[in-house]
From Swiss-Prot:
Pathway: Carbohydrate degradation; glycolysis; pyruvate from D-glyceraldehyde 3-phosphate: step 4/5
UniProt xrefs under SUPFAM superfamilies: Enolase C-terminal domain-like, Enolase N-terminal domain-like
Major site of localization recorded for this protein: cytoplasm
Keywords recorded for this protein, A-Z: Cytoplasm, Glycolysis, Lyase, Magnesium, Metal-binding, Secreted
Family under the similarity heading: Belongs to the enolase family.
Protein name: Enolase
Gene name per UniProt: eno
Any Pfam family hit: Enolase_N
Organism: Methylibium petroleiphilum (strain ATCC BAA-1232 / LMG 22953 / PM1)
Domain of life: Bacteria
Disulfide topology: none
Length: 433
């Protein structure tokens, strides 16, 4: 038995300089596991609650001392003596202790910190790398990275409404080569921007945040960068979009909700018109994935988008599903989207995270493991991606050490797996077969 003998929670800073929760879990054997939780900028309304202090005189109200106090008192009392290898029981203990549907009392940032730290300690105790602890002998598939090279929306201060424009190296023979292709394209794009006199400052997730004429201008610059890096758009490197459409779904002039695209000259579009615009881009450019193409509350819009594009491109629900099996099941039943974004802090425990991944796979939906815009050096999501054979990961651009921590961990895992490592490439998009 790997009994938990001590838990220490603390407040640290994330990649945006905002407080977040870190947790150390000590086992009877002397083994320790440490984990830190991420935080999002654009968040779904039904995400598990991230507990913040609200004291405007300290970290602008974003302190997490309350969550840390919960960790060091009642959470510690509840889990001391439990077997760290019994992850599901431990996570149920945390859920029951909180007693709310959305972890509003203790905070998902507190429960997740413990959940991840316990898993790390148990893996260390068992002598297994974390990805192997999660996936057993079956975890050998590296994820295809969706690399956010242009930031907009809530992740940048520019003219773009869409939050992320991504490159996806579907034609690479290995994860190592996929990272190289992405890095070379990133640097080619940087030179293109520099030569045009456009800022090469980066956003929260390491992508560039240029002010350009419109979204197509940004897409065309990315395609130019792919070409200048020596790769073929579509065949070797495809494109993905994260619209984060909830962020620009607003009341129009007559009071009805519309998609307000300031980056397209102030267009106000219905769900049908916005779908038509997306469909036009899909026909024109090698786009194979669209995340949050409609607002989280616009289920009718989602149904129309899925009907029009669901067989052509991956339609990922992030704010739509918030890593929640109840909401995902509703989407599956209604034929909404064909993929789910997996963000561990949207739900607050590893057990619930794995349940969402498994439900998606059973329904033929893909599961894309994802970072948040506020990250730390914690690389747990890299191990989750391989351990669950998810096949896809979103962990930012090719800059900022908080993003590189995940890519570098995946490079180590691929090296550790050796000849049995699998890089699925386009086959990771099995929802489009």
């Amino acid at each position: 038995m790997s009994a938990i003998v001590d838990i220490v929670g603390r407040e640290i800073l994330d990649s945006r300089g905002n407080p977040t929760v870190e947790c150390d879990v000590l086992l009877e054997s002397g083994v320790m596991g440490r984990a830190a939780v991420p935080s999002g900028a654009s968040t779904g309304s039904r995400e598990a609650i991230e507990l913040r202090d609200g004291d405007k005189g300290r970290y602008l109200g974003k302190g997490v001392l309350k969550a840390v106090e919960h960790l060091n008192t009642e959470v510690s009392e509840a889990v001391l003596g439990l077997d760290a290898s019994e992850q599901a029981f431990l996570d149920k203990t945390l859920i029951d202790l909180d007693g709310t549907d959305n972890k509003a009392r203790i905070g998902a940032n507190a429960t997740l910190a413990v959940s991840m730290a316990v898993a790390r300690a148990a893996a260390e105790e068992s002598g297994l790398p974390l990805y192997r602890y999660f996936g057993g002998m079956g975890g050998m598939q590296l994820p295809v990275p969706m690399m956010n090279v242009v930031n907009g929306g809530a992740h940048a201060n520019n003219s773009l409404d869409l939050q992320e424009l991504m490159i996806i190296p579907v034609g690479a023979p290995s994860f190592r080569e996929a990272v190289r292709w992405g890095a070379e394209t990133f640097h080619a794009l940087k030179k293109i921007l520099h030569d045009k006199g456009i800022s090469t400052a980066v956003g929260d997730e390491g992508g560039f945040a240029p002010s350009v004429e419109n979204h197509e201008a940004a897409i065309q610059m990315i395609l130019e960068a792919i070409d200048k890096a020596g790769y073929t758009p579509g065949t070797q490197i495809a494109l993905g979009l994260d619209c984060a459409a909830s962020e620009f779904y607003k009341p129009g002039k007559n009071g009805s909700l519309v998609y307000q695209l300031d980056g397209e000259g102030g267009l106000s579009l219905s769900a049908q018109q916005w779908t038509d615009m997306l469909a036009g881009w899909v026909d024109k450019y090698p786009i194979i994935s669209i995340e949050d193409g409609m607002a989280e509350g616009d289920w009718a819009g989602w149904a129309h988008l899925t009907e029009v594009l669901g067989k052509k491109v991956q339609l990922v629900g992030d704010d739509l599903f918030v890593t929640n099996t109840k909401i995902l099941q509703e989407g599956i039943d209604k034929g909404i989207a064909n993929s789910i974004l997996i963000k561990i802090n949207q739900i607050g425990t590893l057990t619930e995270t794995f349940a969402a991944i498994e439900m998606a796979k059973r329904a033929g939906y893909t599961a894309v493991i994802s970072h948040r815009s506020g990250e730390t050096e914690d690389s747990t999501i890299a191990d989750i991606a391989v351990g669950t054979n998810a096949g896809q990961i979103k962990t930012g651009s090719l800059s900022r050490s908080d993003r590189m921590a995940k890519y570098n961990q995946l490079l180590r895992i691929e090296e550790d797996l050796g000849d049995v490592a699998v890089y699925p490439g386009r086959a990771a998009f099995y929802n489009l077969r």
